[in-house]
């Protein structure tokens, strides 16, 4: 069988929090307010209020909880808008989101940025494998929380996060996979074909935080690449083994890249948004 690193129950709790956040964000942004949809929103909100305060890393070397904190903040921001006019509910949602910011601060890597593994030192503050895409995910969540709910963010960690993304970028605006990959920029996963689904997230994260380096033209180039080279990540989409196909793409890259591609499209003038 295929060995998956997912220590129970922590890893399962983290993935459930992250996937629930993504689903709830999508439902709320869809504008669907049929009775059965509203019931699902209420149920997910109650689950978040109960479970997110309990979310921690599963073991000292696996920090999948970072995904739950990040997508939890984004879902809470959408709930905050949904509860407009209900001051008590909005206050509870904001307070919960602020605790998630503190958890992200706790799990920031000593090198700057965020990752989800620490196989070597196993320290209280991670010293392991911060990755470009996990850092971009966190930075997008922090930005959304600040813009929508006025969350207080840790300035040092925010600055270090942006600087980490810059260090991961190669001259063609591919982003290497993780911190140690900076020394192997032409390894297959770090080439443009392996960065198709990371560059969307990293480019938009830098832009929303005021970094002008990923220009509109660069954003468009990488959106075009994602569309034209779709086959490479589509092949990976149903492969059970991670990084087993062209340019070491994994199945989840397919969905991750498209999720942030929509944010990239929103950066562009309306005249440039059509394919």
What residues fall within each predicted segment?
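Preference for long, amphipathic alpha-helical scaffolds in soluble/luminal domains
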Residues: 1-275
